[in-house]
Amino acid sequence: MQLELLNEQGQAASKFDAPETVFGREFNEDLVHQIVIAYRANARQGTRAQKDREQVRHTTAKPFKQKGTGRARAGMSSSPLWRGGGRIFPNLPEENFTQKINKKMYRAGMVAILSQLAREGRLAVVDSLKLESPKTKVLADKFKAMNLESVMVIAEEVDENLYLASRNLKNVFVVEPRYADPVSLVHYKKVLVTKGAIDKLKEMFE
């Protein structure tokens, strides 16, 4: 699989021979969907909670007399039928959203995503993204020259300069290969990979 090797002006300077085992596999939509859903589910904190009628703090006094008012009878204001009352089936913080995906499936799904991005022209290669100083403007100008508005950068090493320069840029996500995830790969419009990162991706997914 040949990928575009971009220069600092964002122009295709040459072609780069990428390993077929990582960038030349068929796209498996069902598998990709499964690992994306599982990754998002496993990222949930699981802290959402609502109160039932027992937990809300309301008086237990009867709101009004049983008969003679013309209104529907009511026992207490904590009823789920009342505004501010407890939920009938509340969300509980102990709910478990974990979905298991084995390593073989996860690796195959990641390779399928990378291969599809390469086929669609959404994945490009650069020599490196080394910065002499942690200046956000310098990195922003580089991405602007490359016409990159929404980009995920996979660098072989995210040093302090690159981290500090990129953390305040909108729609820019910089990670090392081991932290690349399926949700981010699918989300960003363009994926920029350094040459060194390709070697590490090959080690991870071959």
From Swiss-Prot:
Kindly give the Gene3D superfamilies that the UniProt entry links to this protein: 3.40.1370.10
For the keyword RNA-binding, the answer is yes
According to the record, the residues making up region (Disordered) are 46-78
Q: Which superkingdom, per the lineage?
A: Bacteria
The record ties this protein, via Pfam families, to: Ribosomal_L4
What is one GO cellular-component annotation here?
Answer: ribosome
Keyword annotations from UniProtKB, A to Z? Ribonucleoprotein, Ribosomal protein, RNA-binding, rRNA-binding
GO MF annotation terms: rRNA binding; structural constituent of ribosome
Q: Name one GO biological process term.
A: translation
What InterPro entries has UniProt attached to this entry? Ribosomal_uL4, Ribosomal_uL4-like, Ribosomal_uL4_dom_sf
Q: What does this protein do?
A: One of the primary rRNA binding proteins, this protein initially binds near the 5'-end of the 23S rRNA. It is important during the early stages of 50S assembly. It makes multiple contacts with different domains of the 23S rRNA in the assembled 50S subunit and ribosome. Forms part of the polypeptide exit tunnel.
Q: Which family is this protein grouped under?
A: Belongs to the universal ribosomal protein uL4 family.
Record text on subunit structure and interactions: Part of the 50S ribosomal subunit.
Q: What is this protein called?
A: Large ribosomal subunit protein uL4
